[in-house]
């Protein structure tokens, strides 16, 4: 089981990591006012990057609220997301949703992304012998 913390190792931190996901996402999960881009990583845990610009959400209070909600939702659902580098791209209107709506929407988005989860090396090796 993946630990439920959200430490530095579970974040996309440098531009090169974001660029890798933007340049070649293997999964795109659109939602209401948001887009998830994901790419497999070779790690046993997922990593999250957030792109919430001023064009999408004008006030910093709103941007920070969304970041907190998205990070918390990710933290609670990360066991099913192992093996992904994920970038969340906010679109206009996301800041106008209530906290419960944002939380529910991301719960559904994580589930949709988990269904298209890449096989780990262990799973791939096991299925080739069957």
Swiss-Prot record:
<keyword id="KW-0819">tRNA processing</keyword>
<keyword id="KW-0255">Endonuclease</keyword>
<dbReference type="Pfam" id="PF00825">
    <property type="entry name" value="Ribonuclease_P"/>
</dbReference>
<keyword id="KW-0378">Hydrolase</keyword>
<dbReference type="GO" id="GO:0004526">
    <property type="term" value="F:ribonuclease P activity"/>
</dbReference>
<keyword id="KW-0694">RNA-binding</keyword>
<comment type="subunit">
    <text>Consists of a catalytic RNA component (M1 or rnpB) and a protein subunit.</text>
</comment>
<protein>
    <recommendedName>
        <fullName>Ribonuclease P protein component</fullName>
        <ecNumber>3.1.26.5</ecNumber>
    </recommendedName>
</protein>
<comment type="function">
    <text>RNaseP catalyzes the removal of the 5'-leader sequence from pre-tRNA to produce the mature 5'-terminus. It can also cleave other RNA substrates such as 4.5S RNA. The protein component plays an auxiliary but essential role in vivo by binding to the 5'-leader sequence and broadening the substrate specificity of the ribozyme.</text>
</comment>
<dbReference type="GO" id="GO:0030677">
    <property type="term" value="C:ribonuclease P complex"/>
</dbReference>
<dbReference type="GO" id="GO:0000049">
    <property type="term" value="F:tRNA binding"/>
</dbReference>
<comment type="similarity">
    <text>Belongs to the RnpA family.</text>
</comment>
<dbReference type="GO" id="GO:0001682">
    <property type="term" value="P:tRNA 5'-leader removal"/>
</dbReference>
<dbReference type="GO" id="GO:0042781">
    <property type="term" value="F:3'-tRNA processing endoribonuclease activity"/>
</dbReference>
<dbReference type="InterPro" id="IPR020568">
    <property type="entry name" value="Ribosomal_Su5_D2-typ_SF"/>
</dbReference>
<dbReference type="InterPro" id="IPR000100">
    <property type="entry name" value="RNase_P"/>
</dbReference>
<dbReference type="InterPro" id="IPR014721">
    <property type="entry name" value="Ribsml_uS5_D2-typ_fold_subgr"/>
</dbReference>
<keyword id="KW-0540">Nuclease</keyword>
